């Protein structure tokens, strides 16, 4: 883009004796234009161009100015510089923030304004005069002005269509910017990593050629010679894991193509009764699975049985497909680990109970979510259900792990039919006698509300294996911890009011503790607590966005988060344009001025405003609790 030459200075409102306005005409010097004295709020200069030009872009080098505005005009009317009407070419642009102006930091910022930053109506016309207006309202300690200013006309059509291949040098005041050719073979950031990825991709693309040749060789050989590769593969056990994987894939392909080789899979069929063993000793299953992977020399007939017993990596995400879980009573980091395992198995996660939720995974009974889901008739299970499904790599019936809720469903029935009868038969008699002891032990620790029939039957624990010891330790760690994101005080208050209004249903005698489906009947026959409407919390913070700034004493930050969430407000993790209220316990901060410059509608309030709204149960004027600058 050609640079527009400047002829002379038409007028100037203020200039220093050394740093005069004529310095803006001299591109090869390091001189500047500054105001005559410090403390002037606004200074301006009018420059005459060589001829009328269309201005395509503007380069401005600052020298202490907070704001710069560029206007354009024409001398054809014969009016003087003071009487002439100017049009805005570049709206007032910020070069220094208030804090930078007071501290004097970054006074020489350079900004390049392209055609997208200029006012289109003025940029499309031709002008021969330019007026530059600088202002510095934040500092009165030093004079200010500009280091340089450059105007560029639109590029020629020939340049736009065929840009020159020469290396050009652009001069911005005292800096020379070298524009490198894109075709030059230079080392760019991240180039080494991209090359490594490309090399790995090309290497992986060339790998399948080996197995395809081996497959052709094996297909050409006779069925009797198929046993000869076994010592080869066994001898290459010290190599990397990739070659054995490729050979196992070949074996799978040969099993599909060669029906005569399938009778070799017949002898392992009597090993079917060994399937219940992993359920009794679950620790042996993870150890045996890597062992089966690590032995590449195993015959094809034996390799087919463990492959069908465990889910492959692509099937892991489908084990809990269609399940929507909600967690209650767990504390980080175990809470996040449990959630990640459920998501890895294909389940979906919700922070609160929603109509599409299917399972509430509870650490212990009588949490707020436990009472809510129990009243809605949802399914409440223990965490061992997710842990066992993750360890066994298959979906287990959730009714074995029920704490409360629906006793059976089509989902559980489908799972039980898919499992072998030999697996389920030895488990049920061994697990059933223990729920009573656990229920009696949990009774004294529960609130004084008499348990309903659902709660007396609810804690029917699942398999009491090695994972139970780990689970009980984590339960001890989770006990007494509140759910992150739960407004537990409000939910507990609502539950207490509901208990005082309606006495609990009398216990039904003679129920079979082993019949899981009776829970569904009790929900429909006995008067359900779900029939009573739960009082809703007011939502006077709806549509309002809050940001917590600074330090808060004690657990005040946690209380503020709970109140804002309870009254349907939204908390922002970072300062953004959406924030409307900044809650702080500190005095006025200089950063607040910068935030107000970016977002004039911000309000800085004390935490007492949130507490007062909670006490009155309505939205109070925030102006009474505002944080204002001190005189």
Swiss-Prot record:
InterPro entries: BRCT_dom, BRCT_dom_sf, BRCT_XRCC1_rpt1, Galactose-bd-like_sf, Xrcc1_N. Residues 242-259, 299-308, 415-427, 490-501 have a biased composition (Basic and acidic residues). Residues 225-314, 406-537 are annotated as: Disordered. It comes from the Eukaryota. There is a cross-link at residue 178 (Glycyl lysine isopeptide (Lys-Gly) (interchain with G-Cter in SUMO1)). Residues 261-270 have a biased composition (Pro residues). The modification Phosphothreonine is found at residues 281, 452, 456, 487, 518, 522. Residues 315-403, 536-627 form the BRCT domain. Its main location: nucleus. Homodimer. Interacts with polynucleotide kinase (PNK), DNA polymerase-beta (POLB) and DNA ligase III (LIG3). Interacts with APTX and APLF. Interacts with APEX1; the interaction is induced by SIRT1 and increases with the acetylated form of APEX1. Interacts with (poly-ADP-ribosylated) PARP1. This is DNA repair protein XRCC1.
């Amino acid at each position: 883009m050609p640079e527009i030459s400047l002829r002379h200075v038409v007028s100037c409102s203020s200039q220093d004796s050394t740093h005069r306005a004529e310095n803006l005409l001299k591109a090869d010097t390091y001189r500047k234009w500054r105001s005559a004295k410090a403390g002037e709020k606004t200074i301006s200069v009018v420059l005459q161009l060589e001829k009328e030009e269309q201005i395509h872009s503007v380069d401005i080098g600052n020298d202490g100015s907070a704001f710069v505005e560029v206007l354009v005009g024409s001398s054809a009317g014969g009016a003087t510089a003071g009487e002439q009407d100017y049009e805005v070419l570049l709206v007032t642009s910020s070069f220094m923030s208030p804090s930078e102006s007071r501290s004097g930091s970054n006074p020489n910022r350079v900004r390049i304004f392209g055609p997208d930053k200029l006012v289109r109506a003025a940029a499309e016309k031709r002008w021969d005069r330019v007026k530059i207006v600088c202002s510095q309202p934040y500092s009165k300690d030093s004079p200010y002005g500009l280091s340089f200013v450059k105007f560029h006309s639109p590029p020629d059509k020939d340049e736009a269509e065929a840009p020159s291949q020469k290396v050009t040098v652009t001069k911005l005041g005292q800096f020379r910017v070298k524009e490198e050719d894109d075709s030059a073979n230079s080392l760019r950031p991240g180039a080494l990593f991209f090359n490594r990825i490309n090399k790995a991709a090309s290497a992986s693309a060339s790998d399948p050629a080996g197995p395809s040749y081996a497959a052709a060789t094996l297909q050409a050989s006779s069925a009797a010679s198929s046993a000869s590769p076994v010592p080869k593969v066994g001898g290459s056990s010290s190599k990397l894991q990739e070659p054995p994987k490729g050979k196992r894939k070949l074996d799978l392909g040969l099993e599909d193509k060669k029906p005569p080789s399938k009778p070799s899979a017949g002898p392992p069929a009597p090993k079917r009764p060994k399937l219940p063993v992993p359920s009794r000793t679950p620790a042996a299953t993870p150890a045996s699975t890597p062992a089966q992977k690590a032995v590449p020399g195993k015959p094809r007939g034996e390799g087919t049985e463990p492959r069908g017993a465990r889910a492959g990596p692509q099937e892991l995400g489908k084990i809990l497909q269609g399940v929507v879980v909600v967690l209650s009573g767990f504390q980080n980091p175990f809470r996040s680990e449990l959630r990640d395992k459920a998501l890895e198995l294909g389940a979906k996660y919700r922070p609160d109970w929603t109509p599409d939720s299917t399972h509430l995974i509870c650490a212990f009974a009588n949490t707020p979510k436990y009472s809510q889901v129990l009243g809605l008739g949802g399914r409440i299970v223990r965490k061992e259900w997710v842990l066992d499904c993750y360890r066994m790599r298959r979906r287990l019936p959730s009714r074995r792990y029920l704490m409360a809720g629906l006793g059976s469903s089509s989902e559980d029935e489908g799972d039980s039919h898919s499992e072998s009868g030999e697996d389920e038969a030895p488990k049920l008699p061994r697990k059933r006698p223990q729920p009573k002891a656990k229920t009696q032990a949990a009774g004294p620790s529960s609130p004084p509300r008499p348990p309903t029939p659902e709660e007396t039957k609810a804690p029917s624990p699942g398999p009491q294996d090695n994972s139970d010891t780990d689970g009980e330790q984590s339960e001890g760690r989770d006990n007494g911890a509140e759910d992150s994101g739960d407004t537990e005080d409000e939910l507990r208050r609502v539950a207490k009011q509901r208990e005082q209004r309606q006495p609990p249903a009398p216990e039904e005698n003679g129920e079979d503790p082993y019949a899981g489906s009776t829970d569904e009947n009790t929900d429909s026959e006995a008067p359900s607590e779900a029939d009573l409407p739960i009082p809703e919390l007011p939502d006077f913070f709806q549509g309002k966005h809050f940001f917590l700034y600074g330090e808060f004493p004690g657990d005040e930050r946690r209380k503020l988060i709970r109140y804002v969430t309870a009254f349907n407000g939204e908390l922002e993790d970072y300062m953004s344009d959406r924030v409307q209220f900044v809650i702080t316990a500190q005095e006025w901060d200089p950063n607040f001025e910068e935030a107000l410059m970016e977002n004039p509608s911000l309000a800085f309030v004390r935490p007492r405003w949130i507490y007062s709204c909670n006490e009155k149960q309505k939205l109070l004027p925030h102006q009474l609790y505002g944080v204002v600058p001190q005189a």
